[in-house]
Amino acid sequence: MGGIKVEKIKIKNLIFSYPNSEKTALNDINLTVNQGEFVTICGKSGCGKSTLLRHLKPILTPHGKTSGEIYFNGKSIYDLSDREQAENIGFVMQNPDNQIVTDKVWHELVFGLESLGINSAEIRSKAAEMASFFGIQNWFYENVANLSGGQKQILNLASVMVMNPTLLLLDEPSSQLDPIAAHDFFTMLERINTELGVTIILSEHNLSEVFPLSDKVVVMEDGKITAENTPYKIGEELKQNSMFAALPTPTKIYYSLGNNSGNCPITIRDGHKWLEKQQINEHFEFKSEKNRINTEPILELKDVWFRYEKNSDDILKGLSFKVHENEFYAIVGGNGVGKSTALSVISKINKPYRGKVFINDDTKVAVMPQNPQSLFLKKSVLEELYDAVFDVEKEKRKNEIEYVIKLCELDNLLENHPYDLSGGEQQRVALAKMLLRKPDLLVLDEPTKGLDACFKRKLATILKSLQKNGMTVLMVTHDIEFCAEYADICAMFFDGKIVSEAPPRKFFAENNFYTTSAKRMADGIIENAVLDKDIIRALGGEAEDLTETNDELNYILPKKTVIKQGKKEYKKLNVHNVVLGIVFVILFVMTQCLFCGRYDNWKNYVAQTISILFIAVAMFNLIPRKKLGKELIQNEKSKRKISKRTKIATLLILFLIPLTIFIGIYYLGDKKYYFISLLIILETMIPLGFAFENRKPKARELVIISALCAIGVAGRTAFFMLPQFKPVAAIVMISGVAFGGETGFLVGAITAFVSNFFFGQGPWTPWQMFSFGIIGFLAGIMFQKGILRKTKTDMCVFGFLATFVIYGGIMNPASVIMWQSNININMVLSSYVMGMPFDFIHAVSTVFFLFFATEPMLEKLERIKIKYGLIE
């Protein structure tokens, strides 16, 4: 009699949609995962796999509209405390670098335990246990930066498992790893599941490694679960599904030959045994590979040596190879051997200290980096595409964009922010940008990373079509199967150089470990079989030859697709703008050299003010500006009511904080300014306590406030050499308008306090904290009431008046109060008169920073608020 199955996770009718999105990311999800099971979730890019996984750890759940229930050990998952989540639910992310937070391996390993307050003896014991279990004792004290991608992912896994979770979630953990590192990683997962009994749920595109480990496979499409079964039976359900191409090689071959789900092989070993029993077509011959293209090299590297630091080890060690015109050249190799470094040298990002890189002068090169996010500069996919063809005439530009949207399947992503897309979707957008540049040489670094099997086929067809139209492709990848089927030449990269190269069949047939699944499955049975279709054809089946390109995929053949003209144009720079900009930069430098530090008469003050205008005019001419569409620039009438916490903050700021400063001056003799400053900060944080009432504040809410304070401090420090030329008031105003008056005051107060550690603390610190703080508070209140709008004009006018009247109006008499014992009206008036030139320069500089910073900063902060549901 079998034991009773204990439900670890139970999801009932889960529906989720992201903010400002009509499409549901998760649609009526129902799923049960029992204790100790290994469950694999698969599906096309953007189908909702990552979103579903993040719902299983509430602290990582994305902001949006959610309905339905999720139970963990029979208890609502939303009732788990942060500590219970950290201890019981582990999460390993797709990119190893995104999860590492410390500099040393052992620091990373114990970070979670230290955060939970575990005592030192227990931490040492658990760290030693994990290091031994995961085999990281040999690099226990190593710098994290020196680790390979596989080691980093093992470290992330160990750092999660040291907390002893009972549920482990993994989001495409092998997407950054080479095949051998991925195999080692999944072997470790198998041990965790079988030896420790940990329940594992992971999403993955590479199913060959995870199928044999899985108890259940879940297939998702458009936010829904479309299939759910054991690995041995799921293949039959997917015969007519696009996900069939993602199945492991033995499974795919088995069902392609018309078999039913009786004894379906899912491992290479099972596939090999099954293949031994099959009737092989003795007269079958593989299609002969073409000879290498006999054309001039479009790219040649000769004895290239490169290192990142003068005294560091060489990364490239005598690298030499040629890529001929109209060739598809693929480079494979393990993590950390120098493949991406070689591409950086080819693209001239880095320069070798020895050797030569030859590229024809008229060769147009486009490089798609390993991280596609480094290409994204705009706030929507459509804007990114327009940015790639900004120099193309309008009508032709539209046709090319319409074509590439259809080609790369971006129709439903055009209004999305590139950073909100899944990894595979980001790869498609990056590829589209590269195609729009129409290069002669297309350089791709891990282009299949994060792509589902269906779009990999589409990518292959695109690349072969580009070749047909005369383009040369150089690709670095871990995807052995992709190289074997579509490349013309494959090369092995090891120890800083290429050690072997050959056509794919010859290249992979001679390898025993770094080779395709089909080759390992057919080893000793079908000689020289490298691809799935080789085995299928040898057994008398039919297989589609995807390398034959479609006529309709001829490059830049326009296809009519309806796209919204929501793009925000940028004003292009011309020679006139550039010349004017350079002239005014020179005038600014000359003025500063002649008048810096001179404040002995009014003429010098005027000169300083004029110098600010010079640099403003220069930046106005040199920086492209947006032609913005109509957006929300004024707070809605329904949201203009002042909240309870804002009223409390008003009382604190207008009465309690001035009272604190007064007591500090007259009862503490102005000598306890550190105490007074800290007291002001504590008083400022009281309204935020009301903001977090009845809910759990997330770390990101505090991080964004800290980041704004850091920007203010860094800005004040960066411009220390220019008297009164400071961005602090501008940053504080923007903070208040974006997140409310209380946040504005807090940012102003903390910025003044922290920056004075660099400029000197003293009795003036509380006064500066109050002055900057009240500017941020008033900016927030005025926007809340609809008086102040999010426009350059409104912000600049308010910034000038606030800095000149409020900051100057407080700090000028403060100088008298701080240093004079017998104060009279003449002293106060004199302080105003003497301070006006300084206040004027400060006010003009605030206008300067607001003019250039208002739109980009408010745009980004607004996006952060919407995406993460932050408070105002």
PLM regions and their residue ranges:
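Conserved ABC transporter NBD signature motif
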Residues: K65-K75, G355-K364
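Conserved ABC ATPase "signature" region
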Residues: A121-W139, Y386, K396-L413
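Conserved ABC ATPase signature
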Residues: N143-L147, H417-L421, E425
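Catalytic Walker B motif of ABC-type/P-loop ATPase nucleotide-binding domains
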Residues: L168-D171, L442-D445
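H-loop/switch region of ABC-family ATPase nucleotide-binding domains
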Residues: E204-H205, T477-H478
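Conserved beta-strand-loop-alpha-helix hinge in the C-terminal portion
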Residues: M220, K224-Y254, K497-M521
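ABC ATPase nucleotide-binding domains
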Residues: K239-T295, Y514-K568
